[in-house]
């Protein structure tokens, strides 16, 4: 119920009284100063709705995930500049970043995605707010502002749905990477998909 509480009213308020005018209000976080916008409003309302349970840094989830106390979570917004996926996780996950080379073509592994924690390690990637990662992955055009990341050239990040709306790509790559372990230690894998709309029916021939 907490996750379903209203967020858009505060976001709409910020659009009308802040984002459409000069953004003069600022806030400090971990030694840096940022301007308040509707993205800030989204995170603030989300934290209030969820009673602060999600108000954590990325690195705070590392040990609980590593010790299997909580499920491993992978967030992958889309980099607008080049269409690649930005993979965010407390764990090292470079194995999700590459496409294997083709057997009939001599070429190197292709970097299909960028691992956030490795790429931005000198910019404090571990200190990323978890709600900021969620917001990057749900940045729908006009509703929330594009996220700008400190790279050169600057990465612009938007909704994960631009590339992989249901996380199928990550799931398949994860399954393929650990297929031997899964075969030896489990009875199988179950995929659970949570959709925001009904699945389209197949068209009869």
Q: What kind of feature is each model-predicted range?
A:
Residues 1-205:
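Catalytic domains of lipid- and phosphate-ester/thioester hydrolases
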